[in-house]
A protein has these predicted regions:
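Bacterial Sec-dependent N-terminal signal peptides
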Residues: 1-29
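Amphipathic alpha-helical repeat scaffolds
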Residues: 130-131, 230, 234
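A structural motif
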Residues: 203, 244-265, 283-286
Length: 408
């Protein structure tokens, strides 16, 4: 259908790809045999059921108390506290943040590309103010979150049918879901009508693009599937939707898409599907994979250890090259789409440009589980163990995910 401006919305992308009908990307051409697939689906159904704990998207009551303890101790030599100060001083984390939107339509490109910088700041502010609320209990942060979200809910009509629509939906549906989850489950003055309004925006504007991604043939680099899946899992928890949650699990463990764990990360070396593309996108992808694992972990499911700690291997490979080591193996493989198979060397583009993703993985594999991640540690050492804002939804991760003082 068209709006009065002539911009096309919600046309199934398979119409743009030449396919006659949508294909379920979750199950198409699985590498598993039929018997293994049945076993896998049975395992997924029985073992990967969310606890539906609230709050429960990236953070639960225990991790919130841990963050509050770090702030209360105010140890100036603690990187977690130093990272908290960086977060607190970010303009997007201020309760007096000045909203730049809202807009009727938002996009990353073409006619509405001019909105991108502003809505990214607005949704980033909702995310960071939600964190500041659960840490400080200063009501001004909770009200700022709901101001941002409800104003967008009142005005936002759609995401134009551009190439990046699904990626946009993945990034920002997650930020919105996280912010709404943190405030709606912990702030007793919230108005249910406001919560309903924001949920309607998520269902009517963002969710159709996420569903669309799952219903079409694979077409993108792997970070897309991981970003979409993180948003889908977050919405599943927000809405207490076990089937949505399990759909995400099936995709990341068994999906025929560059964004599933086994298609994104080589089981032998940890090389990632985008390692030959550039280091910015591969860090984006592996960070999204790590955050999916953390969301599931907070819901009682261990994706971190899945496929023999596959996500850890991806982190270590990526950290090793980005910290400066050249002796990393590289092989050219045929990706799921066949479009991104020409890379014959690891890419030096954006090499060493640190993204705030490594503290998350180090916290789980080393602090919680006692495993070794020498290259991830080297990356953190090189960057003084400080997190930062990347807009990737695990910003300031050294503060957010640091369980060294807890018995995990």
């Amino acid at each position: 259908m068209k709006n009065i401006l002539g911009v096309i919305f919600l046309i199934p992308i398979f119409l743009l790809t030449g396919s006659n009908k949508p294909i379920d990307a979750i199950y198409s051409k699985s590498d598993l045999s039929e018997s293994e697939l049945v076993k896998s689906d049975t395992f997924l159904t029985n073992e990967y059921t969310p606890s539906l704990e609230h709050p429960g998207i990236l953070h639960n009551t225990k991790s919130i108390e841990r963050m509050r303890t770090v702030v209360h101790k105010a140890n100036a030599t603690d990187p977690a506290y130093q990272t908290y100060l960086l977060m607190r001083n970010d303009y997007r984390a201020k309760s007096d943040y000045q909203l730049k939107g809202p807009y009727e339509y938002i996009a990353r490109q073409k006619d509405y590309a001019w909105t991108k910088r502003n809505y990214e700041a607005d949704f980033g502010a909702a995310y960071l103010n939600a964190l500041m609320w659960i840490i400080t209990q200063d009501e001004s942060h909770a009200t700022k979150v709901m101001e941002i979200l409800t104003k967008y809910a009142d005005k936002l009509k759609g995401i134009p049918n551009h190439n990046d629509a699904m990626l946009l939906a993945g990034f920002h549906a997650f930020q919105i879901a996280f912010a709404l989850e943190m405030v709606s489950t912990t702030y007793d003055k919230i108005q249910q009508t406001d919560v309903d309004k924001v949920n309607n925006m998520l269902r009517n504007v963002f969710l159709p693009w996420l569903d669309n991604f799952y219903s079409i043939p694979p077409f993108s680099n792997g970070n897309w599937g991981l970003i979409v899946s993180r948003a889908y899992m977050g919405l599943a928890i927000l809405w207490n939707d076990t089937e949505m949650y399990k759909k995400t699990i099936k995709f990341v463990l068994n999906g025929y898409d560059n964004g599933s764990f086994p298609k994104y990360i080589d089981e032998e070396t940890g090389q990632c599907q985008e390692s030959g593309r550039d280091q910015a996108h591969v860090q984006l992808g592996i960070g999204a994979a790590g955050s999916i694992c953390e969301i599931a972990y907070k819901q009682g499911n261990d994706l971190y250890s899945a496929l023999n700690n596959l996500v850890m291997k991806g982190y270590e490979y990526t950290a090793k090259f980005n910290v400066g080591h050249n002796n990393v193996p590289f092989k050219t493989w045929t990706d799921v789409t066949g479009k991104y198979s020409g890379w014959n060397t690891i890419s030096p583009k954006a090499r060493g440009n640190y993204r705030s993703i490594y503290g998350l993985a180090y916290n789980h594999y080393v602090i919680r589980k006692g495993l070794n991640m020498p290259y991830t540690k080297e990356m953190l050492d090189k960057n003084n163990w400080l997190g930062k804002f990347d807009g990737d939804c695990i910003d300031f991760d050294v503060f957010q995910f640091n369980d060294k003082d807890l018995n995990n």
